[in-house]
Amino acid sequence: MKNQNTPIAFEGFPFIAGFAALTLLTALSAGKLCSAILYGFSALFALLTLFSLYFFRNPQRTPPADERAVVAPADGTVIVVDRVPVTPLGHEALKISIFMSVFNVHVNRVPFSGRVVELTHTPGKFFDVRDSRSSCENERSTIVLETVSGLRMAFVQVAGLIARRIVCYARNGEMLERGKRYGLIRFGSRLDVYLPPDVQPLVKLGDKTIAGETVLGRLG
């Protein structure tokens, strides 16, 4: 799996470079032509460059010392905490869903250490990720992970109305480490986490999460 330690996720480099080049080009052209319109475009591209730097930021995070703690895979707001019968695990599980707005960090992190036993990408629709249909009908990337103790959990990157580009660095059979970066979704999206049904949730609806740090629950 790619190990990104750069302060900006490399998926953002084409956007940043492109907008920065357009900023410079329009500024130089505006100076030569004395064009207020081109100056306006230059200012717009400069703002888009700054927004891209902000959107693709990739801050360092430190997981809690408790090795039983399952951490949030994304920055955002908890929109689902429920035990559901239909899951990627094939049985009832505790489901915790996190909504990422366009203003959240969009780098995704591994909730718990373990081995990838199943990795699937499912084409689908692009409902708003706050719509309950998005979990089972939207395009998504699903990882089923098995811990060293044999417990299984799943975490799902869900594409949304605007976010239509899922990036997942993980590979089948790979060992993942809790808190490490494993993917990204562009421009607003959702992460679903499925835990064993006996896990007690440590977050509630409306709570804000920090990827790699906020504890969602603890495995027994």
Curated annotation (Swiss-Prot):
A cellular component term, taken from the record's GO annotations: plasma membrane
Active-site residues, as the UniProt record annotates them: S189
Pathway the protein contributes to: Phospholipid metabolism; phosphatidylethanolamine biosynthesis; phosphatidylethanolamine from CDP-diacylglycerol: step 2/2
GO molecular function list: phosphatidylserine decarboxylase activity
Subcellular location: Cell membrane
UniProt site positions, description: Cleavage (non-hydrolytic): G188, S189
Keywords, comma-separated and alphabetical: Cell membrane, Decarboxylase, Lipid biosynthesis, Lipid metabolism, Lyase, Membrane, Phospholipid biosynthesis, Phospholipid metabolism, Pyruvate, Zymogen
Main function: Catalyzes the formation of phosphatidylethanolamine (PtdEtn) from phosphatidylserine (PtdSer).
Family of this protein: Belongs to the phosphatidylserine decarboxylase family. PSD-A subfamily.
Protein name (database record): Phosphatidylserine decarboxylase proenzyme
